[in-house]
Amino acid sequence: RVCPRILMECKKDSDCLAECVCLEHGYCG
C-alpha cells in the first residue's frame, strides 16, 4: 500500500492520507 512517511496523529483510518491506516500508538502508518 502507498503511505506517505508523514507523522500524523489519528483516531481512525480516515484521518490518514492515501492508504495509511491508524495504528495502535495513535499515528498513521
Swiss-Prot record:
| Site, as annotated: Reactive bond | R5, I6
Protein localization: Secreted
* CDD domains referenced in this protein's UniProt entry, alphabetically: PlantTI
Q: Which GO terms describe its molecular function?
A: serine-type endopeptidase inhibitor activity
Cystine connections: C3-C20, C10-C22, C16-C28
Q: Which SUPFAM superfamilies match?
A: Plant inhibitors of proteinases and amylases
Task: Give the main localization category.
Answer: secreted
**Under the cellular component aspect of Gene Ontology, which terms does the record hold?**
extracellular region
Q: Which UniProt keywords are listed?
A: Disulfide bond, Knottin, Protease inhibitor, Secreted, Serine protease inhibitor
Name of a matching Pfam family:
Squash
* Functional note: Inhibits trypsin.
The entry assigns this protein to a family as follows:
Belongs to the protease inhibitor I7 (squash-type serine protease inhibitor) family.
Q: What is recorded about the domains?
A: The presence of a 'disulfide through disulfide knot' structurally defines this protein as a knottin.
Q: What is this protein called?
A: Trypsin inhibitor 1
Species of the source: Cucurbita maxima
Please name the taxonomic classification of the source. Answer: Eukaryota, Viridiplantae, Streptophyta, Embryophyta, Tracheophyta
